[in-house]
Amino acid sequence: MSLASLEQTVQTLQALPRDAQITNLITLAGGLSKLAPDSTQHWDVRDVRQDLECADTVGLYVRRDPDGVRLAAEVGQEVTTLTKALTALMVQHLDGETPTAIASVTANQLSKIVPESLLRQRQNTVNYAVQRLQDAVGKLEPVGV
């Protein structure tokens, strides 16, 4: 997909009533398993760890491809639904993008899909999800090295 498709999805989700936003976040979280890394493929970056900000392990997988950056993710069972949903949304929409495009995504953009009452409690989750993906992509070797 693309950065434009991410922004379009964010706008669509933002326009929904609170209950529909929550339902969509749960659906996104449930789809994360389909974005798991394929063990038969090479990954330039395997960033798998449990940070203090997170209840369980988050694994982000990145590789450079002629068509852009390929992304995959897997998380432990204790990871919050919101972290799963945001990770799935970014991996799904940013797969194939350039490192520069991925670096341009802001937590503020993704915050728009989180109901305001939930966002007050979970802003750090949004920041964490965006930063982890950008850090993993940032570990790619520059082209030509």
Identify the function of each model-found stretch:
Residues 1-48:
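Extended low-complexity intrinsically disordered regions
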Residues 29, 93-94, 133, 137:
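Generic structural signal for hydrophobic core residues of well-folded globular domains
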Residues 40-62:
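Structured beta-strand/loop patches that form or line metal/cofactor-binding pockets in enzymes
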Residues 63-80, 94-95:
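Conserved interaction-surface patches within small, structured recognition/assembly domains
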Residues 81-85:
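Short Cys/His-based metal-binding microdomains
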Residues 86-100:
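Alpha-helical support elements that line or immediately flank enzyme active sites
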Residues 100, 105, 109-145:
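C-terminal binding/interaction regions
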